[in-house]
Amino acid sequence: MGKLRRRYNIKGRQQAGPGPSKGPPEPPPVQLELEDKDTLKGVDASNALVLPGKKKKKTKAPPLSKKEKKPLTKKEKKVLQKILEQKEKKSQRAEMLQKLSEVQASEAEMRLFYTTSKLGTGNRMYHTKEKADEVVAPGQEKISSLSGAHRKRRRWPSAEEEEEEEEESESELEEESELDEDPAAEPAEAGVGTTVAPLPPAPAPSSQPVPAGMTVPPPPAAAPPLPRALAKPAVFIPVNRSPEMQEERLKLPILSEEQVIMEAVAEHPIVIVCGETGSGKTTQVPQFLYEAGFSSEDSIIGVTEPRRVAAVAMSQRVAKEMNLSQRVVSYQIRYEGNVTEETRIKFMTDGVLLKEIQKDFLLLRYKVVIIDEAHERSVYTDILIGLLSRIVTLRAKRNLPLKLLIMSATLRVEDFTQNPRLFAKPPPVIKVESRQFPVTVHFNKRTPLEDYSGECFRKVCKIHRMLPAGGILVFLTGQAEVHALCRRLRKAFPPSRARPQEKDDDQKDSVEEMRKFKKSRARAKKARAEVLPQINLDHYSVLPAGEGDEDREAEVDEEEGALDSDLDLDLGDGGQDGGEQPDASLPLHVLPLYSLLAPEKQAQVFKPPPEGTRLCVVATNVAETSLTIPGIKYVVDCGKVKKRYYDRVTGVSSFRVTWVSQASADQRAGRAGRTEPGHCYRLYSSAVFGDFEQFPPPEITRRPVEDLILQMKALNVEKVINFPFPTPPSVEALLAAEELLIALGALQPPQKAERVKQLQENRLSCPITALGRTMATFPVAPRYAKMLALSRQHGCLPYAITIVASMTVRELFEELDRPAASDEELTRLKSKRARVAQMKRTWAGQGASLKLGDLMVLLGAVGACEYASCTPQFCEANGLRYKAMMEIRRLRGQLTTAVNAVCPEAELFVDPKMQPPTESQVTYLRQIVTAGLGDHLARRVQSEEMLEDKWRNAYKTPLLDDPVFIHPSSVLFKELPEFVVYQEIVETTKMYMKGVSSVEVQWIPALLPSYCQFDKPLEEPAPTYCPERGRVLCHRASVFYRVGWPLPAIEVDFPEGIDRYKHFARFLLEGQVFRKLASYRSCLLSSPGTMLKTWARLQPRTESLLRALVAEKADCHEALLAAWKKNPKYLLAEYCEWLPQAMHPDIEKAWPPTTVH
């Protein structure tokens, strides 16, 4: 049976029976006759005669039939149960919506989402801002939101008529749920999300006639179609990849984002791609662009990397994946490259692209430039992004679009997207998922402060002995720590060299060794137990005994039971540690990895380990982002990093071991889990990790920027402070850089100003000089570029190029101060140190060459190595780094090419059999080095100035208050010259000068006048005139700036002022400036020395001649010739005043007297 329908308002519609209705009865109508025969109709309540005689009986309506309640059936119970559940859901809806609103994405994020249902349908998944505005009006975006979720939909009129009646089964519970709804729910729900106004319903078609007098508005006219740009034909370049390589590519997360990335590139000039390490962005995005035709028409896809290792490795990997030759996918780094005319994808370091911008500012050969690893925020990366932001705009105006892709491994892109000076319109950001497999991060319960290297060793031993197969990657801080840990691990787990027939014997030996190891470990524990411990009461809790024991027991159980949680198992301390015992049954393939390692040794980490061994790579932060090592499952992170810090003012550099940032720690953890779920073991607690800075500071804020300032000035960026840096350097760093460049002669001095603000602006906008443009062409630091620019004379260029190349490439000699692992190694290191010290003394020589100091050692080492054909055997025998020597060779070639481009007549070439310099050339080289390193001058502390013992054998520098010392490895360590210049100061236990060369005191005011404060010209010796230079010279004493070191008087140009004009007039009258006037000297009416007398103004002839010289600023030979070129009769009248009247006609005929000089 169907359900009985309950009619609407059934009680009100029920009709009464025959009985009287409820309420007072109506009186019967009565007619009364009056005396005037009229009748009065109605009821007169006051007349008792017309009242009814008796009360009528009331009849009650029959009562409504009441049905007896029947017991509910199972079906009805289910229906009621559903209604109760619905009511419960409605009561909880407000709370649920409130919680959802807290985690709801914003509208800006919602617009970035796309649907995968349109894949392959031809519809765009990524719309530009302009097209979005055309389709949807502002404020009418229909975004899926929780806003208005509590409201009912608007019902059509027809639906209202059809649903007048409700089902009877939903009677009481339904009415309660509708009427007794929580009044607080509506405002709570109304506040969730953003309210979207509902669209007005379309008018329903009606067949009713239109009433008279009403006009029907005509339908709106269709909008004219918008003009659409002509679609360009799609370009697709086929790539023949191998099936195996294609299968590997499909596993990368970025492959699913190819359409999104390419649509964004097509619609926007600048795109930011964020994908953590391992997502494949470095290798796949260039391939996307290549297949889309961005390398057609002889164009190039440029990819910049911050490190040379990454540029070379990535070019080889992409060429292998695309099955193309390295003539098509090439690389270019500082010293080498394989770029050809066929190159279409070019990997390079950021410095190489910056040099290309100097030659071709618009980069016309490039269609796309990719800035990779932008999260590292290297100096050149920041400069490139600032320059490319303007180049993209200029190329767009010329209808030659350039696409810029910025790829970052972190989501720290606010410096790019929220920097209106850099990008006026924020570029779109595309997020790419990274890892295919999860990485579990484990923290230590305790943080080792000192012996983190030993903690790394113990952790690796535990992982290797107890965890399943998988490569191990260990992060340490420096080269010495890497080698020390490698030696310990190789000693603990020596590689197995057994033959197959010896396996059984090895197994027996390993079992016997394990048994002995357990016995020795037990004895060691017993021995440690017998030693009375030293109890420190500060290590104990103040809680009463028993309190907190449960927690401690739980921690012990957790430590022993859950290996994956911490691996914090106690293996003992010191020499008794079981990890130090050799265990040949568990071979470990240990490899080092750091930036100074030879390339062939770096490539070994990418090869599979020998069969039966586990790969363990001990690396510095070079393996943090640039390289992905295959097969790594476990990462051991010490949490430390060694950074070079520079003092902006003093230039002192120091290496400090500090904590990494949280972003760097996450990058290290990302090295695991490439092929399977991985684990990262951090040797610090989670509380320490919480105190890390979120991101490392950009490099441009931590180092001197004079080389960048010079390069930008060469690009005609005069006001560097207005450059669109992603993170601008401090004003102090900019001022220090410009002061150095002014002292080097690369920039013009700032113009004088009356206001301080204007003076500071002038100091930050000094124009570049001709010398500065020449220096900018050399790919070295400004100090070294000044040395190259000054070394053209006396045949010093080949030697200066070699010295500059050696100073640019760091760490020429091997690090021999590392700790030895055995007595044999200690003996070998001692003998090698002695040999290297002897070779340094040999290369330094004696006499004049020894005064060149450490730079002579560099020159001799490079010359000897080149003479021996630069073989690895020679480098190993003499303690030289083969990789450094090869870099010097390449840099020498590059600098020689640059010098020949600036000075073609030099005709330089790299001579492998270069002869040692002569004594005179060594002297010139010392002067050249002094002129380039003038701000790095130091003076030995004299005995009378020595106030404390710490100043013994110390030197004083202008910018430091503390003593500095010559490094013990220097050949001048025992010589102790009075004045030296140094390459750099490195702070360790003391401040040591490296790259030291001796300086003669009389050279300082002549070569470094900008650093000296000169006194007034000396009267004795008297000023003289120099015919070669055409200037007035004098002797002046001076002091070195800031420290006031007294310097001897030297002959310099006479200072500007009225006295210089007086001396020049005197030499002019004497005939020293122009020899033709010397014949008239005996006929002068007054002595030329009258010009210098205090009473000279009393004579008209002296005053008129002086005024004429000052008016044309003629204080030298060159200025006087320029004045006569403008006016040949210049000074004729003034000179005639000094001669008798009879000689005036002869003077007028011979004027100007420039025929003989």
From Swiss-Prot:
Changing T1094M: In NEDBAVC; uncertain significance. Expressed in the fallopian tube, ovary, uterus and testis. Also expressed in the brain. A motif (DEAH box) lies at residues 372-375. The keyword Plastid does not apply. One of its GO terms (molecular function) is ATP hydrolysis activity. The keyword Metal-binding does not apply. It catalyses: ATP + H2O = ADP + phosphate + H(+). Residues 1-77, 116-225, 494-523, 542-584 are annotated as: Disordered. Residues 459-716 form the Helicase C-terminal domain. Residues 262-429 form the Helicase ATP-binding domain. Residues 499-515 have a biased composition (Basic and acidic residues). It is found in: Nucleus, Nucleolus; Cytoplasm; Nucleus membrane. ATP-binding RNA helicase that plays a role in maturation of the small ribosomal subunit in ribosome biogenesis. Required for the release of the U3 snoRNP from pre-ribosomal particles. Part of the small subunit (SSU) processome, first precursor of the small eukaryotic ribosomal subunit. Part of the small subunit (SSU) processome, composed of more than 70 proteins and the RNA chaperone small nucleolar RNA (snoRNA) U3. Interacts with UTP14A. Belongs to the DEAD box helicase family. DEAH subfamily. This is Probable ATP-dependent RNA helicase DHX37. It comes from Homo sapiens (Human). The gene is DHX37.
